[in-house]
């Protein structure tokens, strides 16, 4: 070293250091002044807009903070930060870095640009859904395995079917009384997303449900909302109409009705009676400045990407019934091109008014018996259904490196259009065949390695045989044995979910691959004779059976989804690769564990505690360390919290069932400091408890002791 070139150490800080939380009260004071509220009434974690903020008031916030803190700020503060906590973190980074913090996009761009993965396999790392009779993939699978029919009469909280029912087709009337319906499509935890109650009330329930499913999906993948903030996540949502918007139009038309000259000739009693009858039969809603934005279809993914600060592609897809399977294809391709590091894909469809039933009845497309009899001799039309499903995708290699839960692997997918057919709503078997055949050739796959096909099958006498013929024709060149591939359709269980139909079939297949069981095909007393299964590679499952696979082969399924207008999608999905069994190094390293749970409200936290207890009672084989780690590290930190120290799953169940949440909600995370004590903190026997209680600790200490024994007069194990 050349001594003259060394500089003396500076005793002054090169720049001021701001700890987390340093600006909280100053920011809250500014917000209070601009919003006209007392500071104590402004939570640190609630968004500015949800408390009555506007764009003009946001500019006032920016100016007031510059005056208060004596620093220059840009509009980035308003764009990147919605809460006091986020503004505090931003300002702390700005002070500590001596300039504006890099945007999330700048932080991520270097990692993603040019990181496409070619034609690589794509992993499914999480799924979330709401289907008729099921609010989770696990409940959905249970229903499928039991052969449950989740179709029933139109609920009274939708519309009174008796007001519209006619056994014969008649314009404006409905001849099908049944459908697959969600229990509560209107429920929404607005506070969790910082959305005001007034705005939530006018928002399309499809937007609400997708936001909640994305939140659930992230946690099912093993991440917290904070960990996904600002990342290049793509969002692709299949969605068509918005039946909730009809209520907004009805409200507007109800107001317009009062301006009619003829209306003014009625008595006040008659006018009131008409207004009340209108409200009862057609429904009315409130109003909000964001009403239009909150009900546009493209805003389902766009609002969600904005809410979670996702920076990847965000788009709504409408190819009718094939929409949600098409989103999976687009999402996988987007990942392969490097447009996003991971992607969320799926679809949603709700039936909040009778309108779709009225038009489908006019087209005589529905089942008059209200029974979804896919592949059956008595098939007489489709039964509408509603639901939503989303999955998270990631390159398989990256998912394995990151330790993500790989549920299945998307091997290949393709889309095309029928071109000419006998009618705009009629399928073209040749178009379907061409897609299927070309996909296997292009990806060097063989249908002979597929053991199950999840068909589009809707329960029509002509459509089902047409699809089977297209599959049979496409598979012919590979010489499959007759009746060697099982075939089914989830529409028999939950109805035809239109834009969400494909994702329902996809989630069914992934669950079946995970459990290595093929579920039964219900509502088939005798197969449609036009199918001629005995002359094809396909057969129906009357009961659930183990998923057969040849030695050295992987379980594979194919999925069909076809849309009105001719957009077809076909996909091949494979079971997840086997994970290495847990070795001794992965055994628990401590006798006791700390677990923390949080929620937006105390009631939600208590519900979460009971739900986790119920889950552990059913799945007691989950390692306690994994359960605690997931809840501690991969869950979004919310204000109301519960903590416990536990040494077994059974002990944890008891504490969850009887425990009491912390008395006061946490407004923000406290600042932390680390201390390194140096010498003088050691003492004889300091490792005895760990040595006696933890095999992994004991094994490594014994190895160290044996290594030093030739050079010491005593054993290390005797000291510690």
List the predicted regions and their residue ranges:
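Phosphopantetheine-dependent thiolation modules in NRPS/PKS and related acyl-activating systems
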Residues: 1-112, 533
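Flexible catalytic loop/linker elements that gate and position reactive groups at enzyme active sites
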Residues: 128-131, 149, 216, 427-442, ...
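FabD-like malonyl-/acyl-CoA
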Residues: 81-84, 283, 599, 663-720
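Acyl-group handling in specialized metabolite and lipid biosynthesis
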Residues: 10-19, 193-202, 645
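Condensing-enzyme catalytic core of the thiolase-fold
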Residues: 119-588, 635
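Acyltransferase
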Residues: 412-413, 417-422, 654-664, 699, ...
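Structural preference for long, well-ordered alpha-helical segments in enzyme cores
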Residues: 1, 23-30, 34, 48, ...
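Residue-level signal for inorganic ion chemistry
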Residues: 87, 456, 601, 648, ...
